[in-house]
């Protein structure tokens, strides 16, 4: 970081007037006149100490512990906001906007810059919030909606699987193709109705998914249709059957 010019030249600038003072007398707080050169040296020393202090003791958010605490706080705010929304089924447009804003704050502190190169993505994740109407099926009676939805990704085998639970236990498996270190193209292959009746997916069953945040506990993703998906880790050891 470059030092201010006043520290290099010994000339001081009055913060009140913007004028430089050099080679004259300046009034000190004590009421005694102090030679400018001496006062400049003293102020310069104080400024150098201030700069050194900043870099020796950076603000908390710049330290490793500070970043971790900030991530924890932002995640907690997000989780508390989505908790009463039934995975998004009861979210109003204002709720969706607020969740999106909180999600973007979490995404901004993503500790995993290249998710598809990390093992953190692998495993079975439980969907806890989404804006996808096709998943939420909010217009159906509640007893006809899936109680829990899971998504599994295995980066090493390039497989993805979405699963519903009671009452229908439908699932679908597909292939993923990395487009970069965060985004994949998805091609669904086989649906299983009631968990065991296979139906080949149509060729149009394609999309893209970008992983915008992932750690050991939480994953945020955004689809190519603008939907937000928030998931919590359920089973990091789960493998998609080949």
From Swiss-Prot:
Location, primary (coarse class): plastid
Gene Ontology CC: chloroplast; chloroplast thylakoid; chloroplast thylakoid membrane; cytosol; plastoglobule
Protein location: Plastid, Chloroplast thylakoid
Keyword Chloroplast among record annotations: yes
Keyword field: Chloroplast, Coiled coil, Plastid, Thylakoid, Transit peptide
Pfam family of the protein (one): PAP_fibrillin
Descriptive protein name: Probable plastid-lipid-associated protein 4, chloroplastic
Lineage: Eukaryota, Viridiplantae, Streptophyta, Embryophyta, Tracheophyta
